[in-house]
């Protein structure tokens, strides 16, 4: 049910091409949702020794919006706002990784604990696990910019931790299908009808 973009450690144009390819696969199949994160360069300036410095929050906002702007409008895609910092036990180091797997994980956890037609966002169901911090924590103004551009902000909320704070699909028009839970409900119904 999920297509993950994975790491987006490519130049922006290559990462956008990969994202559009995943969206086209999801649109063709109509039984999956593609989860997409921006390219790493939107947040980090990597040095030759493998360490990176973070861009400013204003730059990150414009970089993230710029990354998603040319992507195909689709209710079968979910766009998130960034990267989390976590411990990689296999390499015994901390690193930034994209959140697309975590956003898909909130949907999977929601399927187990609730139903696909419940929103995977918010403090009750949108918790991002195993994260030390975020590369980018948008403030209210930045969240408004992101959300109006089809991008689901992931934020740190005192008392709640790191949470998915939006439930939009990548659909570019106001519609019932611009919500993750509505798209997933219709996928669930179509599968149930075809199995009957």
Language model: regions and residue ranges:
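A glycine- and small-residue-enriched flexible loop/hinge signal that marks low-structured segments
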Residues: 1-196
């Amino acid at each position: 049910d999920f297509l993950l973009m994975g790491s987006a450690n490519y130049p922006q144009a290559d990462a956008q091409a990969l994202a559009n390819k995943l969206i086209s696969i999801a649109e063709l199949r109509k039984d999956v949702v593609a989860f997409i994160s921006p390219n790493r360069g939107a947040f980090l300036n990597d040095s030759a020794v493998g360490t990176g410095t973070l861009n400013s929050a204003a730059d990150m906002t414009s970089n993230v919006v710029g990354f998603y702007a040319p992507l195909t409008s689709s209710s079968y895609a979910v766009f998130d706002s960034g990267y989390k910092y976590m411990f990689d036990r296999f390499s015994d180091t901390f690193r930034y990784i994209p959140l697309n797997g975590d956003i898909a994980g909130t949907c999977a956890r929601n399927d187990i604990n609730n139903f696909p037609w419940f929103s995977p966002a918010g403090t009750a169901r949108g918790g991002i696990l195993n994260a030390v911090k975020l590369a980018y924590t948008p403030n209210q103004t930045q969240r408004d910019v992101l959300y109006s551009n089809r991008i689901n902000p992931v934020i740190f909320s005192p008392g709640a931790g790191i949470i998915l704070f939006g439930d939009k699909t990548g659909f570019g028009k106001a519609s019932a299908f611009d919500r993750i839970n509505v798209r997933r409900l219709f996928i669930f119904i179509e599968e149930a009808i075809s199995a009957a």
